[in-house]
Amino acid sequence: MTYIQERGSTHVYHVNRMSKEEMDHMISLCVHEQPAYCVAACPFKADTKEMLFYAAKGNFKKALAIYEKITPFPMILCNGCTAPCEEKCRLCELGDGISIREVERAIVRYGEPGKRSSVFRIRKKKKAVIFGSGLFPLFLAGELEKKMYPATIYCQEKDYEAYIAAAAPELLESDRKNEVKRLSSMDLSFEFGCSLDLPFIRAKMKEADVVCASEEVAKKLAPEETADAEIMLREQAGIVSGPVRSVMDAAFAAKRAALTVDLLVQNLSPHSNRGSEGAVTTRLYTNMDGMKGSKKIPCSTDGYSKEEAVEEAKRCIQCHCDECMKSCIYLREYKKHPGLLAREIYNNTQIIMGDHQMNKPMNSCSLCGQCTVTCPNGFDMSQVCKSARENMVSTDKMPLAPHEFALMDMLFSNSEAFLCRPQPGYETCRYVFFPGCQAGAIAPDVVTEAYEDLCRRTEGGVALMLGCCGAISEWAGRYEMTEKVNEQLKQELAKLGDPMIIAGCPSCMKQLKESLGAKVTGIWEILKEIGLPGQAKGLEIPVAIHDACGARGDTQTQDTIRELLADMGCTVVNTEYSRDLSPCCGYGGLTAYANKEMADKMTEKCLERSDSPYITYCMACRDRFVREGRESRHILELLYGINAANMPDISEKRYNRLELKEKLLKNIWNEELMMEKKDYTVAYTEDAISMMDERMILKSDVERVLDRK
């Protein structure tokens, strides 16, 4: 048997199997980090979802801290907020949406303002002046103070309270006092009682780098010009000003104006680098199936009490997308959404020297493709992980250890255990039966019965090919090995006249189609056409079908399996996550070799769906279910009336392949194959066999050591 030569880790091939642009495009498909519908509708991008989360827990201090991020004066903003977020609440589809505005008011009323930290707050050198009073100058003063601009406000009012009253006269006295306290604590300079005539204003303008003003003052300074609504700037006069309209308009205009100030002091165009301002459209997907509507908590004219606000906030369903994570053990175990995990895996491939800490997560994906079906945008984590594995292999950064045993097993199947023969009496054949390496390892008698049946009941000759389709090396990212397997199979098929392949495994069927471009059908399709074997018999109790990963998207195969079971008299129990939504058993993608614990959890997840016996059409699935103590049969076992051995260990699997080859050569082609016989026997305890199976130590490994003595 050929052994795998691992290249030295000091030699690096600069090959990328997936570019950064391709990765960025893939990551953009994941909408997990897209803003919730209410957040996207808010022009200030207030994290309403997070606020409601903390309000529902009664943590009004944390909720207020989130609200304070979007405005320097929360009392004024929440009183004048028109709540565009409320109509976007998904609960509106089922009944009453969340009373977000009233909950926000309760948060501001009952929340404790956070302490202003002076750490890392370095005052900027450029100075700003603000002339006048009203909503826009007030909000702008607060925004500039957040950005640490030394700002001086010149106004006609006599004190802070009058300044607040001029901007928001509708505030209750208690609320006004709170905002006065907030304003007076800011690092701003106020000049109260100013005349604000033109000579005074022009004199003060000379002392500043940036001039801001209320609309009233701006009209005095530049009566012929109006401010650009996008940047809040009278460009010819160089005056930043805003509208005298609603609270929402003034607060939003102040944010735009503050950004304009930032750009002006850096000598940049105020039209550039503005990012996304205002409300946005979200691509978030939230599955509302199973959600129930509810009535909003009634609100008095005084607003919600603390308790009422908590109850109303609890109605929030915290819109998010986790469709892929609901059913994928891999994503749930790593507690990361696909976009983030894909980014970390991609970054892992770019490390030249140092620890590759994402190797195990990269190798733990079963490459089953379930996420492409559950994701509303078809995010394919299997493509990310497979490309990353290939990239790591191509750059000599992928250790052989996680996949070595599986790769050695593939080489064994395609060398010592390999067999390719035409049906006796034929030189070329119409068909070739390719049962797959797992079928020969787990249920060799089924392979024999199936082949003999096909020879008897089909015309044109049926050849037999025992070996591996190359899925093992494909999953491992060892593309060079896959190419060698493809070349070997192509040569053997050519000798047979390039017949149609009858696959006994959906993964083989998929691999052979994609890698060889060959004509492939499933044995189930042939049996549906020629009829059931005489010994076919279903189980007398209800059964559950586990659809193989290789059949994802293959409706014809899924339907045919169900039709054959019905023809055998089986009663099939419908299960959650079946057909294209079916999860992986834990063998796919070589997860069982790279991360056994993860694979075991995948198997358990599969078995949670039903207590009935499982019928599979993938031998690896059948093997893993039996090992978990669940009665499980491959459909070919029912079709040919054979119940294969329950749990062959890794050594028995290899022996079964060799014995199958020997028996078929002898009984069908009258050829003798002498299997090597040792002049000694080794006895193993059950504990030893279990330990060897766990550590993937073959009996032949033990014998090889003994032979050296």
Predicted regions and their residues:
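Short glycine-/small-residue-rich Rossmann-like dinucleotide-binding loops
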Residues: 215-217, 376, 506, 619
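Ribonuclease/tRNase effector modules and their secretory precursors
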Residues: 649, 654-709
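Short, flexible hinge/linker loops that cap or flank conserved catalytic cores
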Residues: 32, 120-123, 232, 425, ...
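Active-site proximal loops enriched in glycine and acidic residues that flank catalytic Cys/His/Asp
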Residues: 155, 215, 242-243, 330-332, ...
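A conserved helix-loop-strand patch within extracytoplasmic ligand-binding domains
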Residues: 520-544
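Iron-sulfur-cluster electron-transfer modules
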Residues: 36-39, 49-209, 335-518, 657-666
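Cofactor-cradling patches in redox/metallo enzymes
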Residues: 166-174, 438-524, 550-663
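Ferredoxin-type iron-sulfur electron-transfer modules and their immediate structural context
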Residues: 1-120, 181, 188, 213-364
